[in-house]
Amino acid sequence: RLRAGLALLALGALALQGGAAWGALWVVENERNIKDQLVAYQFDTPESVASYIEQAGLSETGALYLTASQPRVVPSFEFGRYCARNEPGIGVLGCYTTRDSRIYLYDVTDPRLDSMEPVVAAHEMLHAVWFRKTTTEQDALAPLLEEAFATLGSEHPLVERIATYEADDPASRIPELYSIIGTEIREVPNALEAHYSQYFDDRSKVVDLADRVYRVFDTLQAELEQLSNELNSRNAEIEGLRFTYEETSRVLAADIGAFNEKANTPGAFPSKSQFE
């Protein structure tokens, strides 16, 4: 890693040392890429992050942008310090912060959701990629993203998610489409697939993981709905029992009142046996 980093520095130094205009221009145009490579080479990649790279099918370039963002897995009690946005469904489980160009990932401990973290890591990697693109590059991608989004139809869950993002920040529509479509949508325009192939050796891996996660959420949602229905049924049963109890109590109270009134009336009971 250190040798590779020094090699990059040496290349830039040689270009400048020669005094050639092309050399200086190369360094200026590739300044961010040089920095990314140096940061990535010096980053001590945790085993978990290395696993995300493999599971999500990232390419060497995708892995570079992920590690250059120095991803950190953050425990739940600390996560809100870095990522504060809310979104429907799964909620926010990661973020790319432009203030320090870093990725923060929520530490998901539920084994049923072990496929989530690679998806979120890839999602945030694409945010890191997006913010490194020029306005011209972003504008060229926007119609492809809108085309892919339009083919999903108005009932697709992504419609609600994007609306929530836009309500929070209207400028977030295209960047979020870029990351979500890249990690969760299987069929995209050929030109867009070719673009994503820069960052994924096999994009179907991350889409498969996303599908698996949403199947888990669908199962959990069904279980919650079943539990809610059972509780509503129990509530109705309890309400029926309460009504029966109150009605029985009312009738009993009326009978007791009538008996007491009759008992206090001389001659109301002709014999002791009738009183008893």
Q: Which positions does each model-derived feature cover?
A:
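Structural motif marking the loop-to-transmembrane transition
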Residues: 1-8, 114, 118
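Short pre-active-site segment immediately N-terminal to the catalytic Zn-binding motif
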Residues: 104-120
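Glycine-rich, often proline-containing surface loops adjacent to acidic residues and nearby aromatics
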Residues: 100-104, 126
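Metalloprotease/metallohydrolase-associated module, dominated by Zn2+-dependent proteases
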Residues: 3-99, 141-263, 267
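Active-site recognition of the HExxH zinc-binding catalytic motif
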Residues: 119-132
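Short, solvent-exposed secondary-structure capping/transition elements
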Residues: 114, 129-144
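Short, intrinsically disordered, charge-balanced linker/junction segments flanking boundaries
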Residues: 271-276
